[in-house]
């Protein structure tokens, strides 16, 4: 069985593909897996490190502005896409995959389209509540389309073969909350606010929490991943405290989630998958410049289900926003209701379910 995964650029597009690939090879030990990506994406480093084969294509995303400069750049990008499509056709013909899986990012479009032109079975896995342009354009020709949010279906041209399967995410082993807090040097008896904005951090989140950290630490523990860029600035501005732990990056994220009673973070698809799989109440701050404003769509889905609250990036540092976070830290019953709502949205078996669909499309029996 040969499976070709196309997706990357960011971890949000790559790691769901990796999770599915791992499950496919666990279920079908002899399965051959190949990734297609670009030299500029995270996949150029991560896929070889994980031990998978990687084929690089040169492709860029269209600029969304309307200036003459953007239009001129898009002419060159269109030429690049044509070349990438030709390379993708050659790749699909050479590798003869049984199924081609697209998870988004610039590279997924030419590879999926090439597979569809050649009559290959294709599966699209869409992470966001507002589907990416590749999903919207190519879903009508896909064999199956798997969504993380039911809301995404309304943006697709057809409903046949479309199903909600969740977003494959990292799995974490939960530990006792008190022990988890002690692991980070925090007061085990206090509720804990976990803050993160990605591996590089989020400047607006960091600035807002810096402004109000004394208020948060007066009532709770604050476990704060600043990212590498802001770490020294934030650390130097905050005196040491039994109720405050500032780190550039949290390696043991499962322990951090276990320690937390409330999470303040962006609304990226991977973070939301982790929050819902672990039934964590959250305050989401959508990144205002995300493509297609997809983080706001993601956050809205959780808010409508009662699993989260949203604070806009532009007002995060306000007194009102800090008060809203404090209110949640003081209201255990409300957090409990949010946790139950988040858990109902979770799909911890998403990678396994999608791997089974890939194996079925390939016409291969599990374990063969």
Curated annotation (Swiss-Prot):
<comment type="pathway">
    <text>Cell wall biogenesis; peptidoglycan biosynthesis.</text>
</comment>
<dbReference type="InterPro" id="IPR004276">
    <property type="entry name" value="GlycoTrans_28_N"/>
</dbReference>
<keyword id="KW-0133">Cell shape</keyword>
<dbReference type="Pfam" id="PF03033">
    <property type="entry name" value="Glyco_transf_28"/>
</dbReference>
<feature type="binding site">
    <location>
        <position position="170"/>
    </location>
    <ligand>
        <name>UDP-N-acetyl-alpha-D-glucosamine</name>
    </ligand>
</feature>
<keyword id="KW-0997">Cell inner membrane</keyword>
<dbReference type="Pfam" id="PF04101">
    <property type="entry name" value="Glyco_tran_28_C"/>
</dbReference>
<keyword id="KW-0573">Peptidoglycan synthesis</keyword>
<feature type="binding site">
    <location>
        <position position="295"/>
    </location>
    <ligand>
        <name>UDP-N-acetyl-alpha-D-glucosamine</name>
    </ligand>
</feature>
<keyword id="KW-0961">Cell wall biogenesis/degradation</keyword>
<keyword id="KW-0132">Cell division</keyword>
<keyword id="KW-0328">Glycosyltransferase</keyword>
<comment type="function">
    <text>Cell wall formation. Catalyzes the transfer of a GlcNAc subunit on undecaprenyl-pyrophosphoryl-MurNAc-pentapeptide (lipid intermediate I) to form undecaprenyl-pyrophosphoryl-MurNAc-(pentapeptide)GlcNAc (lipid intermediate II).</text>
</comment>
<feature type="binding site">
    <location>
        <position position="250"/>
    </location>
    <ligand>
        <name>UDP-N-acetyl-alpha-D-glucosamine</name>
    </ligand>
</feature>
<dbReference type="InterPro" id="IPR007235">
    <property type="entry name" value="Glyco_trans_28_C"/>
</dbReference>
<comment type="similarity">
    <text>Belongs to the glycosyltransferase 28 family. MurG subfamily.</text>
</comment>
<dbReference type="GO" id="GO:0071555">
    <property type="term" value="P:cell wall organization"/>
</dbReference>
<dbReference type="GO" id="GO:0008360">
    <property type="term" value="P:regulation of cell shape"/>
</dbReference>
<dbReference type="GO" id="GO:0009252">
    <property type="term" value="P:peptidoglycan biosynthetic process"/>
</dbReference>
<dbReference type="GO" id="GO:0030259">
    <property type="term" value="P:lipid glycosylation"/>
</dbReference>
<dbReference type="GO" id="GO:0050511">
    <property type="term" value="F:undecaprenyldiphospho-muramoylpentapeptide beta-N-acetylglucosaminyltransferase activity"/>
</dbReference>
<dbReference type="InterPro" id="IPR006009">
    <property type="entry name" value="GlcNAc_MurG"/>
</dbReference>
<keyword id="KW-0808">Transferase</keyword>
<keyword id="KW-0472">Membrane</keyword>
<keyword id="KW-1003">Cell membrane</keyword>
<protein>
    <recommendedName>
        <fullName>UDP-N-acetylglucosamine--N-acetylmuramyl-(pentapeptide) pyrophosphoryl-undecaprenol N-acetylglucosamine transferase</fullName>
        <ecNumber>2.4.1.227</ecNumber>
    </recommendedName>
</protein>
<feature type="binding site">
    <location>
        <position position="199"/>
    </location>
    <ligand>
        <name>UDP-N-acetyl-alpha-D-glucosamine</name>
    </ligand>
</feature>
<dbReference type="GO" id="GO:0005975">
    <property type="term" value="P:carbohydrate metabolic process"/>
</dbReference>
<keyword id="KW-0131">Cell cycle</keyword>
<dbReference type="GO" id="GO:0051301">
    <property type="term" value="P:cell division"/>
</dbReference>
<feature type="binding site">
    <location>
        <position position="128"/>
    </location>
    <ligand>
        <name>UDP-N-acetyl-alpha-D-glucosamine</name>
    </ligand>
</feature>
<dbReference type="GO" id="GO:0051991">
    <property type="term" value="F:UDP-N-acetyl-D-glucosamine:N-acetylmuramoyl-L-alanyl-D-glutamyl-meso-2,6-diaminopimelyl-D-alanyl-D-alanine-diphosphoundecaprenol 4-beta-N-acetylglucosaminlytransferase activity"/>
</dbReference>
<dbReference type="GO" id="GO:0005886">
    <property type="term" value="C:plasma membrane"/>
</dbReference>
<feature type="binding site">
    <location>
        <begin position="10"/>
        <end position="12"/>
    </location>
    <ligand>
        <name>UDP-N-acetyl-alpha-D-glucosamine</name>
    </ligand>
</feature>
């Amino acid at each position: 069985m040969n499976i070709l995964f196309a997706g990357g650029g960011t971890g949000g597009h790559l790691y769901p593909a990796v999770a599915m690939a791992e499950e496919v090879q666990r279920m079908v030990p002899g399965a051959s897996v190949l990734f297609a990506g670009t030299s500029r994406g995270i996949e150029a480093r991560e896929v070889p490190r994980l031990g998978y084969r990687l084929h690089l294509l040169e492709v860029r995303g269209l600029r969304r502005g309307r200036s003459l400069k953007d239009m001129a750049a898009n002419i060159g990008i269109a030429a690049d896409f044509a070349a990438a499509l030709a390379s993708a056709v050659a790749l699909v013909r050479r590798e003869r995959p049984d199924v081609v899986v697209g998870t988004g990012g610039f590279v997924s479009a030419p590879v999926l389209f090439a597979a569809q032109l050649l009559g290959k079975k294709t599966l699209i896995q869409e992470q966001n509540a507002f589907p990416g342009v590749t999903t919207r354009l190519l879903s009508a020709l896909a064999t199956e389309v798997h969504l993380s949010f039911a809301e995404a279906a309304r943006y697709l041209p057809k409903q046949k073969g479309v199903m909600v399967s969740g977003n494959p995410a990292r799995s974490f082993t939960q530990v006792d909350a008190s022990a988890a807090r002690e692991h980070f040097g925090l007061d085990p008896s206090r509720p804990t606010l976990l803050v993160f904005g990605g591996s590089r951090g989020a400047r607006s989140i960091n600035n807002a929490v810096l402004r109000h950290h004394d208020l948060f630490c007066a009532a709770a523990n604050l476990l704060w991943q600043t990212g590498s860029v802001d770490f020294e600035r934030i650390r130097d501005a905050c005196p040491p405290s039994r109720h405050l732990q500032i780190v550039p990056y949290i390696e043991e994220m499962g322990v951090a989630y276990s320690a937390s009673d409330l999470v303040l973070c962006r609304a990226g698809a991977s973070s939301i998958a982790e929050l819902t799989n672990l039934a964590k109440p959250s305050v989401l701050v959508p990144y205002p410049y995300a493509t297609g404003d997809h983080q706001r769509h993601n956050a809205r889905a959780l808010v409508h289900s009662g699993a989260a609250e949203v604070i806009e990036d532009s007002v995060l540092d306000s007194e009102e926003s800090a008060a809203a976070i404090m209110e949640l830290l003081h209201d255990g019953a409300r957090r409990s209701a949010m946790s139950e709502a988040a858990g109902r949205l979770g799909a911890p078996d998403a990678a396994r379910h999608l791997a089974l669909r890939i194996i079925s499309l390939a016409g291969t029996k599990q374990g063969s």
